[in-house]
Regions:
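Short, surface-exposed "cap/lid" segments of acyl-processing enzymes
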Residues: 2-47
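Alpha/beta-hydrolase active-site loop
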Residues: 26, 47-65
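The alpha/beta-hydrolase serine catalytic core
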Residues: 90-199
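Gly/Ala-rich beta-loop-alpha elbow adjacent to hydrolase catalytic centers
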Residues: 73-82
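Glycine-rich phosphate-binding loop signature in dinucleotide/nucleotide-binding domains
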Residues: 9, 63-68, 150
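Short hydrophobic segments within beta-strands
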Residues: 15-20, 73, 97, 157
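Short, surface-exposed alpha-helical segments at coil->helix boundaries
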Residues: 24-31, 50-53, 167-171
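Aromatic pocket-lining residues of Rossmann-like dinucleotide-binding sites
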Residues: 85-86
Length: 199
């Protein structure tokens, strides 16, 4: 992120944190629907949670020197990284799209899909899967050792057919946090069709 990338239209900015395979330029798509905010997207190292946390905190700290109101817009696993990185920072509000809210549950689900037990994962350290993810025991331990305490007012956009976060998981999160849930019927985890994007 460079200083020239940050417009100074107001004292309010949204920090956009993309999901897996995304990039900072996705933030551009939100400018027309959120004209009262400056919006900046960041790219970050998503290879391990602590690396993502470091990069997101650095971006936040830079913005905090120039903006008095920082909100967060995050997508998919970007939501997990945002909450991990910014739970101790002053965030005005958050909007999470198809968020990964319980990363430990997702990892355990992926282990089940791959037919991998925790004992096997611990012994081997890392195991590639047929669905494109590499299971990591170190990653799982980090998640367990670094719980999140999220108190930011949060809006969640959830797709009815999300295959990564269950409806039960999102409803449990909403009931125990200062959060509001909007569900798109027949939506998928990846909001990509015209109908889904317009929603």
């Amino acid at each position: 992120m460079k200083a020239k990338d940050i417009a100074m239209a107001s004292d309010k900015i949204i920090l956009y944190i993309h999901g897996k395979g995304g990039n900072a330029t996705e933030a551009d798509g939100y400018r027309s629907i959120l004209p009262e905010y400056d919006i900046i997207g960041i790219d970050y190292d998503d290879s391990f949670p602590s690396a993502a946390k470091r990069d997101i905190q650095a971006a936040y700290d830079k913005l905090a020197r120039r903006y008095s109101h920082i909100s967060v817009l995050a997508n998919s696993i970007g939501a997990y990284f945002a909450m991990l990185a910014l739970q101790d920072r002053k965030v005005s509000k958050a909007a999470l799209i198809s968020p990964i809210l319980d990363i430990e549950r997702l990892i355990c689900d992926m282990m089940l899909w791959a037919g991998v037990t925790e004992e096997i994962l611990e012994k081997q350290g890392g195991i590639p899967t047929t669905f494109g993810e590499t299971l990591s025991y170190k990653y799982l331990c980090y998640v367990r050792d670094n719980p999140i305490c999220w108190t930011v007012p949060t809006e969640i956009l959830y797709a009815e057919k999300d295959n990564l976060t269950s409806r039960n998981t999102v409803e449990q999160f909403v009931s125990s946090h200062n959060a509001h849930l909007t569900v798109m019927e027949n939506g998928e985890h990846w909001f990509h069709t015209d109908e889904q994007l317009n929603f």
